[in-house]
A protein has these predicted regions:
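His/Asp/Glu-rich mid-to-C-terminal helical/loop segments that flank catalytic regions of hydrolases
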Residues: 206-241
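Alpha-helix C-terminal capping segments
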Residues: 66-70, 88-89, 186-195
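Mid-sequence, gly/pro-rich, charge-dense loop/helix-turn segments that line enzyme active sites
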Residues: 84-173
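Generic non-transmembrane alpha-helical segments
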Residues: 131-146, 188, 224-235
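Proline-aspartate-enriched helix->loop->beta-strand connector
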Residues: 72-77, 175
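A C-terminal functional module that forms or caps the active site or interfaces directly
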Residues: 158-211
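N-terminal short beta-loop-beta anion/metal-coordinating cradle
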Residues: 2-65, 71
Length: 241
């Protein structure tokens, strides 16, 4: 991508996501915008802005729209924690979303097929972007010891804390991870014609131990994810998209 300046916005659902993002990405210039805390960093041809959105779909969608209206970013990042829906995805692995599925929308039908309106794709849906991510994933594994997987995310404002629902989401949507907010951020970006990414780190296995695992693993997992995100944004990888 050739651009005099690339504007990147990062939507942080919770306090921990925002604080780790600010610290590890070395963001400063913290201020308040319409009741939201934001911070930023400019380096070479990259300008990154992070916003503390608040947890849940409404908070993250409204924060995404606020940032789009005020700053006109080229890219929006959905970031945060996720539960694993398959034994192939482990704690501290990073999942980069290809397609997100809103699974708990009442369409009056069984959870079998999601209408197109409830499916949103990221830039990793395109072959050229997949190749960039493949190169970056290999580099991250070799230099940082971090595992990055690309796949679908099931998104709904419902805790996935049992193997029945977990298996259903995996089988019917081919999803490898789940969380509350991804679809709301990606859909808001799509409706505004903004390219989107989703980097989500695994904190639990979407089973009966979900709450305990999420609480005990979250901070360490974020410490794994944000250095990777920092490299992707500021070390030239995003310029290749």
């Amino acid at each position: 991508m050739i651009n005099s300046k690339i504007k990147v916005s990062i939507i942080c659902p919770g306090d921990d996501e925002y604080l780790f993002c600010k610290k590890i990405l070395k963001l400063d210039n913290e201020t308040e915008l319409a009741g939201r805390i934001i911070s930023s960093r400019r380096e070479k041809d990259i300008e990154a802005i992070a916003v503390k959105a608040g947890e849940g779909r409404i908070c993250c969608a409204s924060a995404s729209q606020l940032i789009i209206d005020k700053f006109g970013p080229d890219f929006i990042f959905d970031i945060g924690a996720s539960g694993s829906l398959t034994e192939k995805i482990n704690i501290n692995d990073i999942v980069c979303c290809e397609n997100s599925f809103e699974y708990n929308v009442d369409t009056g039908e069984e959870l079998v097929k999601t209408p197109d309106d409830f499916i949103t794709s990221t830039v990793f849906n395109k072959d050229s972007s997949k190749e960039v991510l493949r190169e970056f994933s290999n580099w991250a594994k070799k230099t940082m010891g971090t595992i990055i997987k690309v796949g679908n995310i099931a998104s709904g404002e419902k805790d996935v804390d049992n193997k029945v629902l977990s298996q259903e989401l995996h089988e019917k949507f081919n999803a490898i991870a789940c969380n509350w907010e991804t679809s709301s951020v990606l859909k808001t970006a799509q409706l505004n014609g903004i390219k989107s990414f989703s980097f989500r780190v695994i904190t639990d296995n979407a089973d009966k131990h979900m709450i305990e695992d999420y609480d005990s693993n979250r901070k360490k997992a974020l410490e794994v994810m944000f250095p990777v995100l920092n490299k992707f944004i500021f070390e030239g990888w995003i310029n290749k998209i």
